Amino acid sequence: MGNDLLLGFQADRPTSVSEQQFLPYHLMEDFDKAVVGPDGHKLVKETRTVIKPFTHVVEKEFPLSPTACAICLAAFIIILTLVECKLHKTFWLFDLLLLLLIGVCGAILAVMWFSEHPTVRLNLQILLLNPIALICLLPVVRRERKGKSHWFWAVYFICIILFFIGNILQNYAEGMNILALSLLVRSGMSVWKNKQTPVIQQQKA
């Protein structure tokens, strides 16, 4: 799953012959077929195998698939969000950990935009794993500790909508859409609670 997270939407489009040469095996085949000179002299005289391929046996795999992990995490986020609404509270410590995780992953994706690798530079998954979460982390927590919401959640809600639209252009990593749905619920609920705060304060007054 980690490798899939780094792949952008260009990984899903057909590649040209020159782009396929980025892979050593394809480059080797093209060199083997290459002819130099009018006499038909081949570029490669001989091909030898330095290290023979071998099968790597994984003795113990992680018991859950990426989809199963995404479902468990999404269920936890949604249930926690519903409990918040029921109690009229904000679990700011959970948001602290959540935004930290989102922001760190987003920072990694942002760095990949400067890579020379053609398939990792433009990755729409950065809309979900957003590096802006790191920038807004402390302001969000400060406001939530005072019982208020931050504008970040409204911006993040829009980013997740754009993430879903991005399915047209890119095949996301396994389980990402499930995770995005739970984060859409949480960010949307934060926006809704922000609108409800003045009403609740008036009722208490």
Predicted region positions:
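Polar low-complexity intrinsically disordered regions
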Residues: 1, 75, 89, 196-205
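Soluble extramembrane regions of membrane proteins in the secretory/endomembrane system
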Residues: 1-54
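Context-gated lysine
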Residues: 33, 42-45, 52, 60, ...
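Core alpha-helical transmembrane segments of integral membrane proteins
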Residues: 49-119, 125
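Generic detector of multi-pass transmembrane helix bundles and their immediately adjacent loops
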Residues: 114-205
